Amino acid sequence: MPSKKVAKEPKSVSDGARVLEQLKAENIRWVELFYTDVFGGYNQVDVPLASLDEESFVSGVPKLDGSSVRGFREIFESDMLLVPDIRTLATIPWNPGAGGTVRFICDVRIGGTKAPYDHDPRWVARRTEQVLADAGFDHSYWGPEIEFWVFDSVQLVPSFQGVHDAWAGAGYQINHSEAPWQVGASQPPIRFKEGYHRTAPTDSLVGLRAEMCNILADQFHVVMDAHHHEVATASQSEINVRYDELVPMGDHIQDVRYVIKNVAHQHGKVGCLMPKPVYGDNAIGMHTNQSLWTKDKNAFYDANDKYAEVSQTCRYYVGGLMKHSRALCAITNPTTNSYRRLVPGYEAPVFIAWSRANRSASIRIPAYHRGRPTVKRVEYRTPDSAANIYLTEAALALAGLDGIKKKIEPPAPVNENIYKLSPERRRELEIRELPGSLGEALDCLDSDHAFLRPAFAPSLIETYIELKREEQLELNLRPHPYEFYRYLDV
């Protein structure tokens, strides 16, 4: 893999001047400044190119009210800065009416001091890169496999307002031409769990995914690996991005999510990253591949290991992931809906175990090839596409690093279908279960977060848990339509 320097705070005034001259020469009129909130949402403010100068790329643009962003600042301390990262320059292709438009991803700084803001997920990721470097790992490489849906339409019935009514709830209706429940479709449907690698015309999204990937490559400079239909019906898809280091990969995945939603919208469809919208079929995940490197050597590879060609460092890293897996779920699986995915029978992890080439384990060592150190990696299969990618990568890296520092030896790998093991056999193999709800995951994070402290501020963890508990409570307080079906006659 190519050698890269650890990502540091970018830029100089001269770099900013060069970029501004380039944009002026291209007749760019508007600049979109993007940043990520605590829960992974992309946010933007648009400014005229003429309002920026060279200093904007060093000192920041004063266009952020931190009190208006969930999980950021209080109203009495809310002046914040957006510092554009010139390495993230991209062209926005769907704003022709605005003239030429470009985008920069920004770091968030505190107004007055210009200090990095420790609730900025991108800063947490950048800090984690430094923690890894301090531990002797010059590079870490990441390859999340992002899955998603593109529905023809989604309605809440009778309306979105119904979810807030005290006297009436809202049902939902998903429409897609591939779905077996769709009336009047022109093609045979994709039956539940029979969508994997289907071809056109059964796969109705080949062209749409290609358009997404082309835009990502051409306008957002993201190197693509593959795209395909996934297992579930009703449009379930996957896009694979070429591996990259921690912060750049976070940027890439944010852009993938953004492009999915916007290209779908351009075609009158709904791009969706909700893990489990379709009952009875597979949900979407975000299996996250990762490896640590010292100079140009993969620290996870050992040619002498007969089981999976993994080093002792890799085993300790896996041990750290396994020790903290239940706490990690609060970050890697951050919604109440996430736990409708983590159930038996739908190819999603339920039990904490590691193995070679075993997709029933939560941690898999891919075994496509032997004797190839550059591709040796750990695949952590628990995350889903609703997760904040910066915090997910950072938390996984810190959990694994904790395992390395403390020499946490994982249990023996499990070379059986874990879904079919008896409870007694699972206990014998020291297999624990992942949390069954967001509330349970938050309890685990509340009691196990010391491993995150090298990069996660205590206030960030406290804020995250507090606001996520509010989400869980909001759902728990509301009667569910299925409860009326099940209990109206009790």
Model-found features: residue ranges?
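Glycine-rich, acidic/polar active-site loops that bind/position phosphate-bearing ligands
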Residues: P2-V490
